[in-house]
Amino acid sequence: MVIKKESSYFERLQQIAVSGFSPSALTSYVRNPIDFYASKILRVSDMEDVEENIAANTMGSIIHEALDKLYQPYVGRILIKADFDQIKKQMLPELEVAYQKEYISTSDPVGKNKIIYEVSLHYIKKMVQSDLDLVQNGCELIIKSVERKLEAEIKVPQIGKVKIHGMVDRIDQLDGKLRIIDYKSGATDKGNVGIDPEDFNILSGDYKKAKAFQVLMYSYLYSLNEPFTEASAGIISFKNFDQGYIPFAFKAGRSYQEKMIDVEVLQNFEQVLFALIQELFNKEIHLTEKPV
């Protein structure tokens, strides 16, 4: 399927440019331009996708909300063991509040709701325990922010002013190292967050690198709001939590080595971001369906 970009497309695209492009909106275009057209331009959803993803999205929202509330009181301070004693006491109350926010009764969850409840609790416990282990092993952990909304206005060549935005799940400082972290309820591996250092363009060409694109865009946004010299950016996947924090990395042979986000990385990402937005606005490039 091929769709030509008509005036109505550009009118809606300009609205998005004013309200803001998110990482998920841009990676939906990378995944399949026709899906981007349907969801962002026409604002309709594939009901099969909605049905498939609703449980995962609900659980993800519950975990994010609960962790946000659990850590919010401790933002900006060095965490100690006593803090985790209090966090653990608040685990069930905050989980129930997060559950109610998703319009799910917690009085006696059954069936799929019971599974969502128990799995959410399991992941929250693992996350808190992981942080406690760091502290007990002598690491200095400071939560700088949770659920941080970032936005910025950028000037894209040939396009003009465009707004971008994103919600960063967690920004912390571990033994002095700034970390920009995105939580994922689905599985993630190093290959999803790593790229060949000579091929930044893969970020806008291969949806398998969507997670790398996301953490780089969060880093780019953060740098525009709070400039930094270097930072680590990565994923914590609840599905394969045992892998721990999975940072953005460069491919080195058959393995991946963590790459700190510095000025050069941000400049390379900016070029990819600009080119992707320019493609969206290019009337000569039609929307062509990709196999998903």
Where are these regions (language model features)?
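RecB-family 4Fe-4S metal-dependent nuclease core
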Residues: 1-292
